[in-house]
């Protein structure tokens, strides 16, 4: 039997997303999510050959139990024997990894070294790798790491350096790394296809907007700047993350309000963003649904700040491209693909550049529908393109391990 399928694992600190798909066609045989790890109600849900199912994993279950369930209960002998390799999404690869790699001892050490930049995610990825080796021993030499930071490693120094003492970069690797690179890479290829150009001649500004959010600017198919920084905390307003703030706010919270560093980190990472601005929820849909409701001013406040910050990044990146033709401003991710309101508010700030929204096209582009959302006489195109990070991971894994 042909081993032409890829098992994809995306291990978070308390969850595991998984899929089995054909890297050539994108055909998905299995997909699912195991969540609430280490809690009483640890559970798993899946879609197998189009049929949905769910099960309890047992109190305290985590990555090991979830992967064991997938292997024993969801993968038939035929499906398992068709899997030729395993692709792991890795949030942070530091400077060491500029592309996807087959996992060996040195790669594991590199992922361990980058834990300092992704303390929640990278340890979970390492658990996923270890468990994949144990549960699928026949594929031990066929595990591939696909790094979210790799796409951004083409940034020039002026984009990735912070104006800090240079030795902090040379000795400790403190610099801009970015995130969501797998999504930005996929959307770049889709913009190229839309423009009828080779990827290495494509220029784009890509807005990946979900609970986390980032913008990148691409020249000739390569990332030249991105909004996330050393960690995924920098940049846009996000669901619970603050994005850009005056660094001195940290000193103020510590000295004047008596907050500990742990409390400050918790505030910036888990209690800010849309949640902080609304004081109700991190869900963008609340702000959209109540935007015109005068009795809920927090909704308009949150969406206006969110969209304004987004527009600032898009405008700055348009300036950075200079004379290079911009093929498209692309929106993707849960909010980018579905929130016509956010797209409208952000693009309305860019009229100086000749960006002209088509209201009907913008409203139509949602729920998985892609398309151009600007008017025919707009100076630049804005498009909505659903992302497919799993397909990129599968394709990279297939190139290296099949």
From Swiss-Prot:
Listed GO MF terms: acetate kinase activity; ATP binding; magnesium ion binding
Cofactor(s) required for function per UniProt: Mg(2+); Mn(2+)
A Gene Ontology biological process term: acetyl-CoA biosynthetic process
Key words, A-Z: ATP-binding, Cytoplasm, Kinase, Magnesium, Metal-binding, Nucleotide-binding, Transferase
EC number(s) given by UniProt: 2.7.2.1
Residue pairs linked by disulfide bridges in the UniProt entry: none
Amino acids binding Mg(2+): 10, 389
Origin superkingdom: Bacteria
Binding site for ATP: 17, 208-212, 283-285, 334-338
Catalytic activity as recorded in UniProt: acetate + ATP = acetyl phosphate + ADP
Alphabetized SUPFAM superfamilies for the sequence: Actin-like ATPase domain (SSF53067)
Site (Transition state stabilizer): 180, 241
Binding-site positions, substrate: 89
Biological role: Catalyzes the formation of acetyl phosphate from acetate and ATP. Can also catalyze the reverse reaction.
Protein name: Acetate kinase
Phylogenetic lineage: Bacteria, Pseudomonadati, Pseudomonadota, Gammaproteobacteria, Pasteurellales
């Amino acid at each position: 039997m042909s081993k032409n399928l890829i098992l994809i694992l995306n291990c978070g600190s308390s969850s595991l997303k998984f899929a089995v798909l054909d890297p050539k066609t994108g055909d998905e045989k299995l997909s699912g999510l195991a969540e609430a790890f280490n809690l009483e109600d640890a559970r798993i849900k899946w879609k197998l050959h189009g049929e949905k199912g769910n099960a309890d994993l047992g109190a305290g279950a985590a990555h090991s139990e979830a992967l064991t369930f997938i292997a024993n209960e969801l993968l038939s002998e035929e499906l398992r024997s068709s899997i030729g390799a395993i692709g792991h999404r890795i949030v942070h690869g530091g400077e060491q990894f500029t592309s996807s790699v087959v996992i060996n001892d040195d790669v594991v050490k590199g992922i361990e070294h980058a834990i300092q930049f992704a303390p929640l995610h990278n340890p979970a990825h390492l658990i996923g790798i270890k468990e994949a080796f144990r549960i699928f021993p026949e594929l031990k030499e066929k595990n591939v790491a696909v790094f979210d930071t790799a796409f951004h490693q083409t940034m020039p120094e002026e984009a990735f350096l912070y104006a800090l003492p240079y030795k902090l970069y040379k000795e400790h690797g403190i610099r801009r790394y970015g995130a969501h690179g797998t999504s930005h890479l996929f959307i770049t290829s889709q913009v190229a296809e839309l423009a009828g150009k080779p990827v290495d001649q494509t220029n784009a500004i890509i807005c990946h907007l979900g609970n986390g959010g980032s913008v990148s600017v691409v020249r000739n198919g390569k990332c030249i700047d991105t909004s996330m920084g050393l960690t995924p905390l920098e940049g846009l307003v996000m669901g619970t993350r603050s994005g850009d703030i005056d660094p001195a706010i940290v000193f103020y919270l510590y000295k004047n309000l008596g907050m500990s560093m742990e409390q400050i980190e918790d505030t910036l990472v888990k209690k800010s963003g849309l949640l902080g601005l609304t004081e109700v929820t991190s869900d963008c849909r609340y702000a959209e649904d109540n935007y015109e409701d005068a009795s809920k001013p927090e909704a308009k406040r949150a969406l206006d700040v969110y969209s304004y910050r987004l527009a600032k990044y898009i405008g700055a990146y348009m300036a950075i491209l200079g004379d290079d033709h911009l093929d498209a401003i692309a929106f993707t991710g849960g909010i980018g693909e579905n929130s016509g309101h956010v797209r409208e508010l952000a693009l309305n700030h860019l009229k100086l550049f000749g960006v002209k929204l088509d209201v009907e096209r913008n409203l139509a582009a949602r729920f998985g529908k892609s398309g151009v959302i600007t008017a025919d006489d707009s100076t630049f195109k804005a498009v909505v393109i659903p992302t497919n990070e799993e397909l990129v991971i599968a394709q990279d894994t297939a190139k290296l391990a099949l």
